[in-house]
From Swiss-Prot:
GO terms for biological process: translation. It comes from Clostridium botulinum (strain Eklund 17B / Type B). The keyword Signal does not apply. Pfam families: Ribosomal_L28. Transmembrane segments: none annotated. This is Large ribosomal subunit protein bL28. Belongs to the bacterial ribosomal protein bL28 family. InterPro entries: Bacterial_rp_bL28, Ribosomal_bL28, Ribosomal_bL28/bL31-like_sf, Ribosomal_bL28_bact-type, Ribosomal_bL28_sf. GO terms for molecular function: structural constituent of ribosome. The keyword Iron-sulfur does not apply. Keywords: Ribonucleoprotein, Ribosomal protein. NCBIfam families: L28. One of its GO terms (cellular component) is ribonucleoprotein complex.
């Protein structure tokens, strides 16, 4: 499953994590993706959406 929001196109970000002794280790930060049923052009469809888009009202859930 792709870790990418279908609304805002938010995806995984790679970077470096620092410990207290300043040792570095590579890691990734993934968005909080939920699989929901949303109305797309009036029909319910399963989409992968981040929680930021859900909370801001960019997606209308299908009931």
């Amino acid at each position: 499953m792709a870790r990418r929001c279908e609304i805002c196109d938010k995806g995984v970000v790679a970077g470096v994590q620092f410990s207290h002794s300043h040792r570095q280790s590579k890691r990734t930060w993934a968005p909080n993706i939920k699989k929901i049923k949303a109305l797309v052009n009036g029909t319910p469809k399963t989409v992968r959406v981040c929680t930021r888009c859900l909370r801001s009202g960019k997606v209308q859930r299908a009931i």
